[in-house]
Amino acid sequence: MLARLLAVFATISAAWACADGDGHVHEHPRRANPSSPLTPPTRPLEWGDINIIHTTDSHGWLLGHQKASFPEPNYSGDLGDFASFVSHMKEIAIRKDVDLLLVDSGDLHDGTGLSDGYPPGSVDGHESTKFLAELPYDVMAIGNHELYVYANTLDMHQNLAPKLNGRYLSSNVNITLADQNNKTVDIPVGSQFAKFKTRKGRKVTALGVIFDFTGNDHNTTVQKVEDMVKESWFLEAIKDEPDFFLLAGHMPVSRDNWPLVFNAIRAVHAATPILILGGHTHIRDCLQLDGRSMSLESGRYMETVGWMSTSLDDAPSKSKNLTFSRRYLDPNRVTYEARYHTRESQVSFDTKKGKSITAGLNQLAVDFDLNFTYGTAPHDFTITQVPYPSNGSLLSLFAELATPYALSANSGRADIPNYILVNSGSQRFDIYAGTFTKNDQLTASPFTDIFFYIPEVPRKVALDTLQMMNENGSENRKRSLEREEELYRRGDVRARYIDWLSDMDQRSIELGRRVANNLTLGYVTKDSCPGVGDDVIHTPLPFYSVPDFIGSNPPDVSNDTLIDFVFVDFVVDQLVETLNIVQSDKEYTSGDVATYSTLETSEVLGIYAQFAWN
């Protein structure tokens, strides 16, 4: 599914096209007032000789999270607010006479309307990335979401990389282009490495490494990490000793291949500090591969701004462990303005650049008509914060209400009983109470799968197929793990992110944190680094497990009644395979599959909202 990511917000179907009539609003986006006051940071940041502000996996969330239900207000700061924060922090670094670097670890595309809501003929993220380029990033690294569509990769190569002056890094990613003689050449999307000096004159060798990604588009190439570290250019790049290595890459700091890069450097430089800024799995995480290194991963969707600091030693032996600190900041104006951080009041906080970025992003939202309103959601619909099925479950809403209604209006077979099966991963983000806009639809349900069906399937066989696809029998579990690994290689991090949420919730139950009624909902991080990483103390989000596949309400017919078995194109192969396990009367093949509707899953919620939420 991720390989078929949203490339264009398609022309809205006639069934729900906007006629600018009553009930539809096209207004300027606004941040909602939080349902409770925001909690300020708990303690000062620890500064060192080297300090890093880190972002990763922003996925277009440049106007912040604008809903009133927690935890959304924790992350309500927009990119303009962040730019002002960075500016003030740079001033503090100068006063302290230390270095402060700004680093990003990739995935700028695919997440909100600012990146994905562009008009036909444009390129995903082209406009939104311009605003990121206005910040003083010292290093940016490529992510897998820059590689699903060749046009996006080319845009990064032609438009973002030049603005970074050699510091947009793609150590193991190439793009295929035609040279002046019209011959194809493979060259790095950005730069393979960068060497530069900090404001204080410290020498830095930087790399930008992506995980072993296999879902990239044609005419792009991702080299395996284990092969990259054997390349002559890599060995030459790390030959000379800098004051520290800066490894900024789109790869999680746990359970992946950073140790391959780390060990290759350690084989040459046994004690040189190595600072790793990872990403991709959307979690807050930290570990130390040795006493002179730290690895930090800073969440997703501008829900986290990471902080890392260390003080270097001048001893020739460099045998002692270094002292590191890390912090996970909630990106909102209370955090940014806090006396522990910038100590700026609301009056003096906003910089000219920050205000310009905010105004530009708001204008982009207007240009893309992102606040076109389909209806008003009566309450929150979340993916994992409530049980499935339930009235507050987005999965229940999508499978049991929205999809059946949308298909009934967009199929020529509505008079035939059907059962609909979709993958729960089709829903990417929660829906919160209040206006449901074009931006909310792009955020919650971005994938462009269409609906297929197999006719004349017994009702019981269809229901058994869903059950079998979700079962955890040993053989099924093995197949599930194999599919999960394949999905991970193609860029799907949902399983790891959900595991992280589950662990967080389980720890809170064991520690009795649920009774802390004075705390607001948010992330509660346990990582492998010393001390407490979270800048603000929260009570963790409740977590309920969800199945991989969900179904509509079964039709009110007998079990042997022949029905239309409807499903999204993403699950075709697995569904046909499972059909042949749960029954033996017929050998199903892909030849039995036909198009049920050209309606895309990304359109379903808008159709339903116009019907039910007005």
Model regions and ranges:
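Classical eukaryotic N-terminal signal peptides for Sec-dependent ER targeting/secretion
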Residues: M1-F9
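Non-catalytic terminal accessory segments
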Residues: W16-I53, N74-G77, S87, E91-L100, ...
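N-terminal catalytic scaffold of extracellular/periplasmic and nuclease hydrolases
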Residues: L2, W16-W307, L312-S317, Y388-A414, ...
